[in-house]
């Protein structure tokens, strides 16, 4: 199957009438180094960016960065009238990680993100593009508030599976509600696998330990096909999350302040996100139930009159007016 970078090929957009993909202001560790030079110069001229230094932009709060990205999107709508515009807002994720979901801070962050969406809608209307525009608002996950952290690496260290130096025979990498365990010594991998399962099977806070034969059902690759995939997948119980800590005394840590976490299995209803679609090609008021995130990109491609033949997802036809654009 093709890599992810090929699933939404540039030709899909060009066939739909896009003239360029050169306007880019990415969310990357060095964000000011990578935008299109023309766009970066214009944003500096508008006072949205101070200079060409990453440090100046990164000194802004998460809320201020979202404001800058939204203003850049409004500028592009006004001056470029793009065929496709993608905007990533960070404030809801940042705040809920720090303060937990369903808190005053979380609701304030949601209100701010909603205001930015309103800015986009108003820019579309001011540009005279309302009848030609579809707006999709989607989030990639929900949030839960854990009360304890499980530290698998502490267990591994105490069992002799982690020793000083670069070679650690077992290393857990947390994704919040799940964690990958990498078994890094080929000569002892199967013995280490059995040992890890034995050590963690009855550990507080761990709901399940999944081996590669269970990965496909979760849309995960097997380690032999993708070296970035772990050899085992740990699943946290309700109220727990994983950490990467290796040097704590205890393998369980009490959380004494509100925080938020995600990365739990998609079967956890708290992981459900948001999906809203409005505008050109969208039926008013359909009852969709739970929408799969893998269906979002094929649906957007369908609105552009294109197909993504290698994508795992499908077009959400109950959402769209027929016939689809060509």
Please place each PLM-identified region on the residue numbering.
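Soluble non-cytosolic domains of exported or imported proteins
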Residues: 60-67, 104-111, 190, 287-294, ...
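Active-site neighborhoods of enzymes that stabilize oxyanions during catalysis
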Residues: 168-299
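Loop/turn elements at helix/coil->beta-strand transitions in domains of secreted/extracellular proteins
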Residues: 80-85, 130-134, 205-206, 228-230
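Acidic/histidine-rich catalytic neighborhood
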Residues: 132, 139-184
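Short, small-residue-biased leader/transition segments that mark boundaries at the very start
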Residues: 1-13
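Active-site His/acidic residue clusters
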Residues: 19, 71-119, 187-188
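Metal-dependent active-site segment of extracytoplasmic phospho-/sulfohydrolases and closely related
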Residues: 111-156, 300
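Formylglycine-dependent
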Residues: 14-71
């Amino acid at each position: 199957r093709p890599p992810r970078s090929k699933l939404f090929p540039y030709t899909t957009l060009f066939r739909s009438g896009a003239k360029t993909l050169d306007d880019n202001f990415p969310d990357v560790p060095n964000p000011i180094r990578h935008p299109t030079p023309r766009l970066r110069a214009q944003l500096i001229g508008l006072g949205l960016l101070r200079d060409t230094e990453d440090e100046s932009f990164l000194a802004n709060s998460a809320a201020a960065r979202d404001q800058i990205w939204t203003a850049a999107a409004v500028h592009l709508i006004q001056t470029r009238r793009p065929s496709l515009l993608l905007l990533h807002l960070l404030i809801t994720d940042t705040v809920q990680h720090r303060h937990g979901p369903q808190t005053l801070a979380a609701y304030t962050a949601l209100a701010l993100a909603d205001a930015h969406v309103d800015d986009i809608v108003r820019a579309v209307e001011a540009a005279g593009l309302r009848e030609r525009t579809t707006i999709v608002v989607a989030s990639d996950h929900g949030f839960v508030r854990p009360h304890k952290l499980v530290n698998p690496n502490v267990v591994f260290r105490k069992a002799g599976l982690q020793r000083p130096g670069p070679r650690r025979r077992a290393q857990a990498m947390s994704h919040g509600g799940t964690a990958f365990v990498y078994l890094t010594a080929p000569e002892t991998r199967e013995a280490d696998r059995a040992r890890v399962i034995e050590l963690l099977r009855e550990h507080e806070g761990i709901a399940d330990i999944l081996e590669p034969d269970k990965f496909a059902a979760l849309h995960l690759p097997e380690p032999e096909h993708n070296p970035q995939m772990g050899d085992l997948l740990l699943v946290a119980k309700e109220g727990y999350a994983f950490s990467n800590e290796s040097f704590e005394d205890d393998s369980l840590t009490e959380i004494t302040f509100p925080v938020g976490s995600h990365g739990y299995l998609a079967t956890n209803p708290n992981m459900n996100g948001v999906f809203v679609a409005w505008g050109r090609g969208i039926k008013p008021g359909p009852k969709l139930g739970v929408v799969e995130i893998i269906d979002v990109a094929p649906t957007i491609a369908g609105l552009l009159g294109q197909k993504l033949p290698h994508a795992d997802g499908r077009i959400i036809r109950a959402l769209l007016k027929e016939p689809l654009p060509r």
